[in-house]
Amino acid sequence: MVFLFAKSFVGMLFVEERSLRRSLSSSELTACVGLVFVEGVALVGGLERVDDWRGTKRSYFLYLEVVFFLEDWELLEMSKAGALDLASGLGGKIEKDDVLSAVDKYEKYHVCYGGDEEERKANYTDMVNKYYDLVTSFYEYGWGESFHFAPRWKGESLRESIKRHEHFLALQLGLKPKQKVLDVGCGIGGPLREIARFSSTSVTGLNNNEYQISRGKALNSIVGVDQTCNFVKADFMKMPFPDNTFDAVYAIEATCHAPDAVGCYKEIFRVLKPGQCFAAYEWCMTDSFDPNNQEHQKIKGEIEIGDGLPDIRLTRQCLEALKMAGFEVIREKDLAVGSPVPWYLPLDKSHFSLSSFRLTAMGRFITKNMVMALEYVGLAPKGSQRVQLFLEQAAEGLVAGGKKEIFTPLYFFLARKPQSDVL
């Protein structure tokens, strides 16, 4: 049965993935989506009998194509949309034969595998690099080019909210055309490209992961910002820039990977021009977090292992770190508070959306089985299923943390470097 599933899933999905998308019109998709959806759901629940599989697999794959087409139609911009794309990127720059060993080493940094916070902080470069080599392909497959959350309005799509969240940061910084801007921990550059085009600025992306930089450069070239935007491979605790280099600096859910917030913010302070601003969205535990509550600690641990974090700071600790680094805090707010649509909704298994299908319970179930099939036939490296598993664990922790209001990925602050930067 496993072989039949692997052979059918991998073979048919790869062959039909783009051909169906090209051959079906939007009206045809609208006409068939209801029927195909029902048949797809029936298949998911009926894999016990081979006859059922053979009789419905065409409808199931058509269903997948309807969903993936609609994702494009809804402008989710999945830059690596296919199963082959996912398979080819798994492991990043790690040799395929070494992926399983890298997963073992990464997991051992975390509490549930015997690791501790001090070890994670001491080895944060290795831990975070392994993490992003292992997960970037999954992120891009399921989330798109911008690896972050956003507060949402009712009726607003996930992709629209992500763009607005990036524009908000640019507007808070007051970016002007031709300014030199630094994106600290830029991922594959989704926000970098969006903010550069929105504000007509030149953005440098700082990242310590070689695989993500290679993806970012390729995507910059595709959209035509490779002449105005660039990437630098470096540790944000030791930036290779002269003092007072940038007109503005921002970080989107990235400096949470720093082992020391004060040290990271001091480096940002150093490379920022006097009188200019630093804005960020930070991952934080809120004041509702109780370190003596075992359930709270379990949720925190799930987020840490699933998201490559040495620790998760409290909002007030980030605020204090900014001041210790020399910044004047202009404003700060947890944007999760009062958001009409919860930031964690795309990860909530009770939520279903065609436009963000791959993040739903059914979409994640399909991805799980697809990864199993890819690994079984040798197209994905051994260890890929375990990466998918700790990402599932992260999703559960994030949703639980959001619902209990003990965690936020949306702690926003805007801080200024004084005209006189003598501390």
Tell me what each language-model feature is:
Residues 237-248:
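A short acidic, Gly/Pro-enriched loop at the edge of an enzyme's catalytic core
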Residues 76-141:
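N-terminal auxiliary segments of SAM/dcSAM-dependent transferases
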Residues 145-146, 151-179:
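Conserved alpha-helix/loop element of class I SAM-dependent methyltransferases that forms part
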